[in-house]
Amino acid sequence: MSGNNSNDLAQGLKQRHVTMLSIAGVIGAGLFVGSGHAIAAAGPAVLLAYAAAGTLVVLVMRMLGEMAIASPDTGSFSTYADRAIGRWAGFTIGWLYWWFWVLVIPLEANAAAAILHAWFPSVDLWAFSLLITLALTLTNLCSVKNYGEFEFWFALLKVLAIIGFIVVGCIAMFGFVPSSQVSGASHLFDTQGFMPNGLGAVLAAMLTTMFSFMGTEIVTIAAAESKDPGKQISRATNSVIWRICLFYLVSIFLVVALVPWNDPALAEVGSYQTVLSRIGVPNAKLIVDIVVLVAVTSCLNSALYTSSRMLFSLSKRGDAPAIAQRTTKAATPHVAVLLSTAAAFLCVFANYVAPAQVFEFLLASSGAIALLVYLVIAVSQLRMRSQREARGEKIAFKMWLFPGLTWATIAFIVAVLAVMALREDHRAEIIATALLSIGVVAAGLLVHRKREAAGKVALDN
């Protein structure tokens, strides 16, 4: 079975592309650099924050897997929300998700450009940013195979980097590196205990870490452009547990075991660079910079791919301009790619010409979109599963302990959103995301009413 929205696109992704994408889809710059801020806030108890956020992602991916295996579709959860909840839900979450990845494009381009500018200071920052964005846009315009090939090698480098870090970290922890400044695991408890800043700090860290997992769901979008999407999605969903445990929990455990959580370097230069420097690895900064460059370039590549596919899917359903449906001879949605890139450039332009508050609002508006996506996936699975069971369909891939665990997941997401609204450091994100969501819902209702009215007029004539 395959969804309607994926039929017009090429099935150019090979098994190794989807496999590597699923393995490394959760690895971003947030792990290599951003995790240092979470550790500095929560101490060793940040492990609990990552475990809680990781558990949520595992449950959401299981729900998404149940729907995607039954009906693979380029629109993924947006299409399922359309079917299970209503047109307004699919319209809203589809556009919010597109907006999230459009914002990611300039942010990741600037992050990559900053690293390259540090190596080659004679070249302006904007030139590197423009060059990287245009190069990856051209790559995505050619064929989906190009995206898959780039992501395969990006993902392989990220995986090798983490495995290398874990191996070096374990060797140092067991005292087999004579030149190392750190060894053992005493820092888990010897600096004001395991939870030095209390449960509130762990909760705050969980809110931060939760967004580092955004991108896990991309495999369900990409798999629709492979020859056996159901099989690919099943593999990706079943492997998400060990991926999160290995890449996040094990690597973060090594960081908090080897380095005191209150070491200023964690927040200043990042967790990986701090640990490698303390172990005595030569050129630790250069090594981490290369890995981060690969990670942010990979994220930029995925942002271009994901935003274009979501826009294409919205267009196929009549929820976006019809021109976004157009494809090349290689069955690539080139107009959707160009429109997404153009929107990203408009965001950059707004940063320069609009008041600072405008761009701050644009950034804040994406703050809670990840949680809204997870919430929509859970509600869609709850309703779609009930609908399928009522029709007597055989469900090959099931969410565990349905419906109890689905309801528990929904309650947890709502609770996290409520906590974000109560905390001053996250309230702006909730307000901005809520305002944007209301605007998108209103636009969707207006579009659908006009379409229904036009349809009635056509029937009357």
Which role fits each region the language model picked out?
Residues 73, 96-110, 213-226, 248, ...:
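Membrane-helix boundary/coupling elements in multi-pass transport proteins
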Residues 1-35, 40-45, 58-62, 74, ...:
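Membrane-interface "cap" regions at the ends of multi-pass membrane proteins
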Residues 153-154, 323-334, 371-428, 460-461:
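C-terminal membrane-solvent junction of multi-pass transporters and transport-like membrane proteins
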Residues 3-9, 46-47, 121-124, 156-289:
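Helix-loop-helix junctions that connect adjacent transmembrane segments
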Residues 139, 161-165, 311, 364-395, ...:
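Hydrophobic alpha-helical segments of multi-pass membrane transport proteins
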Residues 10, 23, 33-128, 132, ...:
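Extracellular loop-to-transmembrane helix junctions
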Residues 79-81, 86, 118, 205, ...:
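TM-loop-TM module centered on a large, flexible mid-protein loop between adjacent transmembrane helices
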Residues 126-183, 214, 237-241, 363-376, ...:
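Membrane-interface loop-to-helix entry segments
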